[in-house]
Each structure stands twice: as structure tokens, then as C-alpha cells.
Amino acid sequence: MAALSLTGCVKDELFDTPHPGKGSITVTADWSARGEGIATPESWNLSMGDYHGTETAATHAPDHLFEPGCYSLVAWNPATDISVSGTSASVTSTADGCISGELGWLFTSVQDVTIEADRDHAFTAAMQQQVRQLTLTIRLTGDAAERVEGISGRLSGVAGTMDFASDTYGAPSSVALNFTKITQGENAGAWTATVRLLGITGESQQLTGGITYAGDNLPSTPIASDMTALLAGLNENNTVPLSLACDLETPTQAGVTATIIDWEVQEEVNADIK
């Protein structure tokens, strides 16, 4: 009897990617939620698990492969006077005991993602603007208005930190308001200060400061204003600058604090500043 020889066939398992046990990612940053006139940042950072990368293009495709599982994908851009650790942003302190009011434009994105083995994943990081611009304009009236040499101030209740994963604000701080005189345009003669803030926090926001005059005959005038109600919505709608203006009569006697009560929201006005 002839011997019968049987040959067995082994079928190779087929995979969809060169990394069957892990997953890859491609992340595209969406910068469309920017305020008017704000440029797309030159670079941005991405953190996911034990991976950290920096990108200058719109899309980041790292060589790094990820184990299957759930991750938090965090993206942000470097911004002047803001440091980021995890999902916490902190504002730089200044020598006068305040925090910086000259922040760069910070954008962030946080999302939970799931990585599957043997799969290439494509994600979009919708970058949200986290810094809002605030402008205060004081229109001076009264006999001493033309003698005003300078206006200085501080705004309290400003957020020194923010957790952009939970949208919570902390570290109540003050920011300096450096008013400059407008020399042309609709508000010529008024004094204005512009700051960029992460947000507000704490129970109240108070403006304090002083008006100084040319010459030695008139002492400086303290100024004060409770801004709490006016700034209650500052942490929302960051892409739209907030501009507030008021009329303030210069006091005619020494030792009187000029209290500002009636602020009004104003449209953005182009002006030349001295």
C-alpha cells in the first residue's frame, strides 16, 4: 500500500497596520475659534500619556505608538507670560507684586480618546481661546482735567491660575493698569489702559488707583470703582474684547476719592495713544 503524505497549511494572520499590538495617532489643530485679528500660533504642544511633542504645522503625526486604552489628549500653544503644567495655566508674577497683564494668546484643547490596537487614529484638537482683552477708558471732566499728568491703577480679583480641563479659576491676584492718554480720534483727551487676562476669580473685582497732576499745587486724587458686576461675565466669550468707558470729574478739593460708578460698554475705537 502506498503511503499517503498529508501536508498541512498554516494561514498567516492578517493585520491592517504595521503595528498590530498598538495604535498610532494623527492630530490636527483647529484654530478657527480665534478672536478677530489674532494670528495662528507659530507652534503648539501635545501631551498624551507618556508622549510629549511640539508641532509647527497644522497636523502632528508622531512616530510614537500607544498601547490600547483610554487617554487624555491635551494640546496648547506657548504664550507670553503663561506657563502650562498638565492642564493648569499660571500667569507670571511681576516685580510690583501683581501678575502680568500683557499675556500672549493662549489656546487649549482637552479631550478623552480611546486607542485601539492595529489602528491609525485621526483626532482634531479644537483650540479654545483662554485669554480675553479688557480695555478701560476714563474720560476726564472738570477744571483740573487738562492738568492731569498720569493715571495709575490696579484691578484685583484677577485669576492667576486656570485649569482648562475643568474651566476653573484660582489664585486671586491684582494686575497693574497703565493708563495712557489718547491724542486723536473720538476719545481724544481720555485715558485708556488695556490688559489681557486669563479671567477673574474670588468674591470681587476692585479698581483702585490715583490721578496725578502737573505742578505742585494739586495733590494726587485717589480713584476707586467696584467692577464686580461689570466683570461678572469676563470668563465667557473670550474671543470678543471687552471695552468699558466712564466719565470722571476731577475733584476740586484735596483728600476726596473719585469714585467711578457709571461704566458703559463701548465699541472698539481706533485711537492714537500718547
Regions found by a protein language model. Name each.
Residues 2-32, 264-274:
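Bacterial Sec-dependent N-terminal signal peptides
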Residues 128-156:
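Short, surface-exposed binding/anchoring microloops in extracellular/periplasmic proteins
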Residues 21-27, 71, 132-134:
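Short structural boundary motif marking the start of a folded domain
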Residues 19-20, 124-131:
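Conserved "repeat-terminator" motif of extracellular CCP/Sushi domains
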Residues 39-89, 149-232:
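Tryptophan-paired
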Residues 248-274:
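Eukaryotic extended interaction platforms
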Residues 80-122, 216-253:
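Structured interaction patches on ligand/partner-binding surfaces of diverse proteins
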Residues 27-41, 137-146:
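Structural motif
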